[in-house]
Structure formats: structure tokens, C-alpha cells
Amino acid sequence: CEGMSFEEVVDFAAENHLECLEVACWPQGGASRRYAGVSHIDVAGLTQEKAKYINEYCKKRDVEISSLAYYPNTLEPDLEKRMAYIAHLYKLIDASAMLDVNMITTFIGRDPHKTVTENLEIVKEVWPPILKYAEEKGVKIAIENCPMLFTEDEWPGGQNLMTSPANWRKVFEILDSPNLGINYD
């Protein structure tokens, strides 16, 4: 749905008898990797008025928003980038609550230059405040489980820690929250 407006995406879903969709909500301005930068809802500029319009548009077409989607590497080794990614994730949580979607889909992330054990330590620092905020807003977070392999130098770990049942269990032990789950697709 890259290049399509929010309305075009919803209309496509309705015309093809789809009941719900995950709506891309990347920051405005694009990004360098495939699919990054696609944004059908500008969560940074979302107002109550715009949220009402979005909900009414979907309702008229009998299409539900299942989640708001943003897939950055929240364990990015560059701290400036990491903080920008996390700041947008908070906006996604706010928008999900405002739209009464109450679900976001994202990645846990991974520093591809560190071991699983080292990445789990970063998870302990980065994710508890995000989850606490989501819990306070009544928003669930579903983590996608693909490895995010884009270039040869990311093998074997990729940019997402949530790639195997063993890693899932370790992350869920650290982040014991009823608001955290897996987006299995």
C-alpha cells in the first residue's frame, strides 16, 4: 500500500472484503529501508478531530483497524536514532489509545553486533518504561518475529531479537506484562 492514502487503503480493504487492517504509521519524511517511511496515519499530528474522522471513515466501510504499525530497531546501537525511534513509539501508543484501537505492532529490535545475552540486557533498560506507558494507556504491544535481515553484514542475528521460541521465552521472562505478545504472521 506504499504510495496510497489512508482512504485508498481502507477503500481497497473494503472492496476486497477485508475485515481489518494493520495501518502503517512511520514518521513523516520517509526512511532508507524497504517499507520504512510508509505512513497512512500521521500519529505525531493526530488530533481528536482527525481520530474521529478516521474512525468514522472505517466504520462506514465496515473495516476495523486491528493495530497501528511501526517497525524500528528500538535496540539500535546509535543512541540518537534509538531515542528518536522510541519517541515515535510513544506517539504510536498515544494514537492507538486515541483511536480506540488499543494495539500496536512493532519490533523489540537488536544490536546486530552484540550477543543475545547482551541484547537481553539492553531489553531490560529500554522496554520496561515503554510497556508501563502502554499499560497505563490500555494499549497492547504485539512484537513481530521476523529477523530483519536487510544486508549481508547482519547475518546471523538480524535487527530483531524475537526470532525464535527460545528468545521469546527469555524476553517474556524479562518483560512480564499482560500487554506484551507476539504478532505472528
Q: Where is each model-derived feature located?
A:
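Short, N-terminal intrinsically disordered low-complexity segments that are rich in Pro/Gly
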Residues: 2-3, 44
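Loop/helix-junction capping segments adjacent to catalytic residues or to phosphate/diphosphate-binding pockets
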Residues: 3-4, 113
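Acidic/histidine-rich catalytic cores of soluble enzymes
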Residues: 4-10, 14, 68, 118-185
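Structural motif corresponding to the early beta-alpha repeats
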Residues: 19-129, 135-140
